[in-house]
């Protein structure tokens, strides 16, 4: 019975991961493609682009949007293997797709099972790297280990497993834009540290001005 269930889950993964087998396009996952605008992708997942999370605004605009396929999939469709998809945008364009697979849907599957399922979509892995961690700036680091990697000159696809939650995930990203985003995030953090003292001064002044305005108003209106 367990063997049948495991085979069924693998079939679901393969079906979801195999829109085309010829001329594998690493820059897409299911119906989502790197380089898509925030506005266009929001329409695809039925969300308001204004609800995207603002991560950093300077020196580059970094935003994220979370999509839960299980919540939106009709009950009549085949089982959904993905728990969550995190979309990352650089200056309004999708540069990274971070997928978290549902624990129940992947229960009992080995790392080789997952590699085989993903390979049905992206071809033979270019590297099997069980001891390599994802970059420290990645959402899943440092507790994730890459199992297999598919890549070309512009795109990297990484199948990983989290140590803490023991779940599988997939990260699809543009190498060039991911590097630009990482640099922008580091620079933004640096600017925030530099501006923190002045921001605190401004905050305290704003609170003091607000309190003084309330005091003056109440002085005029107070009756004992």
What are these regions (language model features)?
Residues 1-9:
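Bacterial N-terminal signal peptides that target proteins for export
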